[in-house]
Amino acid sequence: MPKAVFGGGCFWCLDAVFRKVDGVRDVVVGYAGGRRPNPNYEQVCTGVTGHAEVVEIDYDENTVSYDELLDIFFKIHDPTQLNRQGNDVGTQYRSIILYLDEEQKEKALKKIEELKKEGLNVVTEVKPLEIFYPAEKYHQNYFAKNPHQPYCMYVVAPKVEKYLKIKNENKKT
C-alpha cells in the first residue's frame, strides 16, 4: 500500500477529512519533519522539536491517486499561512508535504506551481520523510471519538463538511 504524509494545521482535522476519502484505508496521526527522536505531544506543542503535526495516509491507488490526495490537502487547509492554521499558531501547524519518493516530490512541487500560477502565495514546505512518529493513542481518530468536544465542533467539523461538499459537487460533474 502506498502512503502519503501531509501536515496542515491540527492533525485532528486532516485525520477526520482523509478518513472520509474513498480509497483511504487508514490514517495515523503523528509527528514528522523535525529533529527530536520519539517526540510526544507536549514536546511538539512547544515548537522546540521542529516536528509538525502530520497524518500518514495509507491508500489504495486503484481508487484514489496521490494527485487526488494532494488536491484534497490543498482544499482543506490554507497553504498560504506560515506556521499556522486559523487560531492554531506555531511551527507544529505548518503546511508541509513529506514525500516518500521522487515521484511524490515532483507531483507536490507541480501542484504548488499550479497554485502559485493561480495567484496563491503558497508557503507549503516540501521535504523528504525521514521518520514518522505515531502520536499518542488518544489522538488517533480523535474526531470520531470526540465529536462534541468544542474544538472538534468549531474547527474540525467545518473542515469535514467542506470536504464532503466538495466531494458531492465532484460526483455531480
Swiss-Prot record:
Residues annotated as catalytic: 10
Keyword Cell inner membrane: no
EC number: 1.8.4.11
Disulfide-linked positions: none
Molecular function, one GO term: peptide-methionine (S)-S-oxide reductase activity
GO biological process: protein modification process
This protein's UniProt keywords: Oxidoreductase
Protein origin, superkingdom: Bacteria
Family matches, as Gene3D superfamilies: Peptide methionine sulphoxide reductase MsrA
Enzyme class: oxidoreductase
SUPFAM superfamilies assigned to the protein according to its UniProt record, in alphabetical order: Peptide methionine sulfoxide reductase
Keyword NADP: no
Xref: Pfam families: PMSR
Catalytic activity reported: L-methionyl-[protein] + [thioredoxin]-disulfide + H2O = L-methionyl-(S)-S-oxide-[protein] + [thioredoxin]-dithiol; [thioredoxin]-disulfide + L-methionine + H2O = L-methionine (S)-S-oxide + [thioredoxin]-dithiol
InterPro entries recorded: Met_Sox_Rdtase_MsrA_dom (IPR002569), Met_Sox_Rdtase_MsrA_sf (IPR036509)
Biological function: Has an important function as a repair enzyme for proteins that have been inactivated by oxidation. Catalyzes the reversible oxidation-reduction of methionine sulfoxide in proteins to methionine.
NCBIfam families from the UniProt entry: msrA (TIGR00401)
Family, per entry: Belongs to the MsrA Met sulfoxide reductase family.
Protein name: Peptide methionine sulfoxide reductase MsrA
Species, as recorded: Nautilia profundicola (strain ATCC BAA-1463 / DSM 18972 / AmH)
Gene field: msrA
